[in-house]
Amino acid sequence: MKELEREILIIGAGPAGISAAIEAAKAGAKVTVADEHDTIGGQLYKQIHKFFGAADNHAGMRGFEIARKLEQEAKELGVEFWLNTVAYGIFKEGVGIVRDGDNFIVKAKKVIVAAGGIENTTAFPGSTLPGVMLAGAAQTMANIHRVLPGKRMVVVGSGNVGLIVAYQMLQAGAEVLAVVERDDHIGGYGVHAERLRTAGVPIFTDTVIKCASGKTSVEG
């Protein structure tokens, strides 16, 4: 099997992976970033809304704009990107990589795993029915593939992610019946909640989802 040597190998070209690559490159390291997708930026490409926060932390920019900015900065620092590349295991010989149909081992002095986050979810009767999905999946369908996840939907969770996704589904043409929150208060920013209320979407606190009903997909 072919072997390659690299100083630093980062697995994942999302916001964490690119940021790590930039900092390492600024310190003088030779950095290679591998990602299974064909674009750099990871979840940032799902984020079509403008970010809040400090000006030096990309406030006022949309996620895909942040991704492009980070990509440009990384490439200017000499960071090498391997896209459409799968890292399938870390062994004593090195990191197993499949790239462009070739299987090889990368021997790196340092390996940073930034393979992405996992969304929290709530299990309930019917939660495995087709039509029940996490926020990230809904964003991927609507914002990347331009496919509406559903015509009528309920969003569970009133944190910033839930509120933003609910509004994005409205923008995409879905009917958002409600946002439900188990706590006694809304978890996200008031500006996001107010935007939904203005659009006629009720937000119910102290409310839990009991079940999703349907035989082959969600019907209620």
PLM regions: where:
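Rossmann-like dinucleotide/flavin-binding elements
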Residues: 5, 11-32, 117-184
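Short glycine-/acidic-enriched loop or helix-start segments at secondary-structure transitions
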Residues: 20, 43, 92, 122-124, ...
